Amino acid sequence: MASRRLALNLAQGVKARAGGVINPFRRGLATPHSGTGIKTQTTTLKNGLTVASQYSPYAQTSTVGMWIDAGSRAETDETNGTAHFLEHLAFKGTTKRTQQQLELEIENMGAHLNAYTSRENTVYFAKALNEDVPKCVDILQDILQNSKLEESAIERERDVILRESEEVEKQLEEVVFDHLHATAYQHQPLGRTILGPRENIRDITRTELVNYIKNNYTADRMVLVGAGGVPHEQLVEMADKYFSKLPATAPVSSASILSKKKPDFIGSDIRIRDDTIPTANIAIAVEGVSWSDDDYFTGLVTQAIVGNYDKALGNAPHQGSKLSGFVHKHDLATSFMSFSTSYSDTGLWGIYLVTDKLDRVDDLVHFSLREWTRLCSNVSEAEVERAKAQLKASILLSLDGTTAVAEDIGRQIVTTGRRMSPAEIERIIDAVSAKDVMDFANKKIWDQDIAISAVGSIEGLFDYARIRGDMSRNAF
């Protein structure tokens, strides 16, 4: 299933924090403490393939997977949807294993095999007992290098993906965020959807699938990741055995050149009015930060200050942020969610609003943007400390299990080339001050162009110029 959801939980792509010193007089049957010795190791093979892992000697299971620096952004308008289509075909048989043999082999191990596609990455991974890791790596290499891509399988999956596309169109949040990308990055690779338009899904050919593999599944764009009870040296040996014949690089193409060009953020809006939908669903964003930007963590802290709100929760009046308190007091929204979505060279920082108070849509948007402009000049240390505490807690909670750790390693190595140490992450977050937040807001929010995506009963949403004007209006 493609990973299309853009809403960022506070820990998207962030890292674990190492534990303290191990007490040599550990009580019997205690859960083994990780200590400070656990670290991420990396090795690069001769063909450029990176192997990265975090070994936990007490873990009974491991997650291994291949993170590929290619997603829908690496496609053209004509081939949009190819990466996701390939993900569906991955488990439909290889030159060595039929689909039934593949499924039976995974089932007999009690393992889990999965894949997903995003705008910038394609990922294939497996979770299994430590002793079955070599079998899983063998299966992964077989899928990546020997998939048959039979015409019969392509036609079957074509129908499956078309039905999936119909289901996605029923999910308002997905629709709003897809349109947000489309308007913010108009006529650029990052503005395309992951599934692709239906006409592409109907027309994608085997040749296009093969060409996508040839142009993107190369060693310089791939990272073999391991997390759990698999030693790094063992993973390197398996990588050398199974992936040493991968081509080092791909031929330069117009699609590859375009995909690496930093996209322009375009202030604009897209509105789809449908009064049969009982709510107004609105996303507003400014240009955010990339994964490697110096302001990445400041952006996350600023996002946490704006916060989230859900009227249905029992603690709705007390969800921490000033905006959530104001929205609840005046009954302006059903929910809202702040987000900071990052890519390799750009990002989207904003808020997603849902309300059934259709005569107060303008008030909701106005006071949300008033909160944004407040951040430019009036942020207290107390709310910054609360946001930092939330962020650090969310980081740890998001890294529960080997699959989450593998995801973090793979994403970081693919996008930035290194995995930041846990101590470094904590130090950076702790160093963020109220002044840093205000500096970030003045640079990224104050009087900046915005992208707006709105779906549903949106008659009450004012015109773009009026909303854009709120980006430079004093909060006082």
Curated annotation (Swiss-Prot):
<dbReference type="InterPro" id="IPR001431">
    <property type="entry name" value="Pept_M16_Zn_BS"/>
</dbReference>
<keyword id="KW-0249">Electron transport</keyword>
<keyword id="KW-0645">Protease</keyword>
<dbReference type="Pfam" id="PF00675">
    <property type="entry name" value="Peptidase_M16"/>
</dbReference>
<comment type="subunit">
    <text>Heterodimer of mpp (alpha) and pep (beta) subunits, forming the mitochondrial processing protease (MPP) in which mpp is involved in substrate recognition and binding and pep is the catalytic subunit. Component of the ubiquinol-cytochrome c oxidoreductase (cytochrome b-c1 complex, complex III, CIII), a multisubunit enzyme composed of 10 subunits.</text>
</comment>
<keyword id="KW-0482">Metalloprotease</keyword>
<keyword id="KW-0472">Membrane</keyword>
<comment type="function">
    <text>Component of the ubiquinol-cytochrome c oxidoreductase, a multisubunit transmembrane complex that is part of the mitochondrial electron transport chain which drives oxidative phosphorylation.</text>
</comment>
<feature type="binding site">
    <location>
        <position position="164"/>
    </location>
    <ligand>
        <name>Zn(2+)</name>
    </ligand>
</feature>
<keyword id="KW-0496">Mitochondrion</keyword>
<feature type="transit peptide" description="Mitochondrion">
    <location>
        <begin position="1"/>
        <end position="28"/>
    </location>
</feature>
<dbReference type="GO" id="GO:0006627">
    <property type="term" value="P:protein processing involved in protein targeting to mitochondrion"/>
</dbReference>
<comment type="function">
    <text>Catalytic subunit of the essential mitochondrial processing protease (MPP), which cleaves the mitochondrial sequence off newly imported precursors proteins. Preferentially, cleaves after an arginine at position P2.</text>
</comment>
<keyword id="KW-0862">Zinc</keyword>
<dbReference type="GO" id="GO:0005739">
    <property type="term" value="C:mitochondrion"/>
</dbReference>
<dbReference type="GO" id="GO:0046872">
    <property type="term" value="F:metal ion binding"/>
</dbReference>
<keyword id="KW-0479">Metal-binding</keyword>
<keyword id="KW-0679">Respiratory chain</keyword>
<dbReference type="Pfam" id="PF05193">
    <property type="entry name" value="Peptidase_M16_C"/>
</dbReference>
<feature type="binding site">
    <location>
        <position position="88"/>
    </location>
    <ligand>
        <name>Zn(2+)</name>
    </ligand>
</feature>
<dbReference type="InterPro" id="IPR011765">
    <property type="entry name" value="Pept_M16_N"/>
</dbReference>
<protein>
    <recommendedName>
        <fullName>Mitochondrial-processing peptidase subunit beta</fullName>
        <ecNumber>3.4.24.64</ecNumber>
    </recommendedName>
</protein>
<feature type="binding site">
    <location>
        <position position="84"/>
    </location>
    <ligand>
        <name>Zn(2+)</name>
    </ligand>
</feature>
<dbReference type="GO" id="GO:0017087">
    <property type="term" value="C:mitochondrial processing peptidase complex"/>
</dbReference>
<dbReference type="GO" id="GO:0004222">
    <property type="term" value="F:metalloendopeptidase activity"/>
</dbReference>
<dbReference type="InterPro" id="IPR007863">
    <property type="entry name" value="Peptidase_M16_C"/>
</dbReference>
<comment type="similarity">
    <text>Belongs to the peptidase M16 family.</text>
</comment>
<feature type="active site" description="Proton acceptor">
    <location>
        <position position="87"/>
    </location>
</feature>
<dbReference type="InterPro" id="IPR011249">
    <property type="entry name" value="Metalloenz_LuxS/M16"/>
</dbReference>
<keyword id="KW-0999">Mitochondrion inner membrane</keyword>
<dbReference type="GO" id="GO:0005743">
    <property type="term" value="C:mitochondrial inner membrane"/>
</dbReference>
<dbReference type="InterPro" id="IPR050361">
    <property type="entry name" value="MPP/UQCRC_Complex"/>
</dbReference>
<keyword id="KW-0378">Hydrolase</keyword>
<keyword id="KW-0809">Transit peptide</keyword>
<keyword id="KW-0813">Transport</keyword>
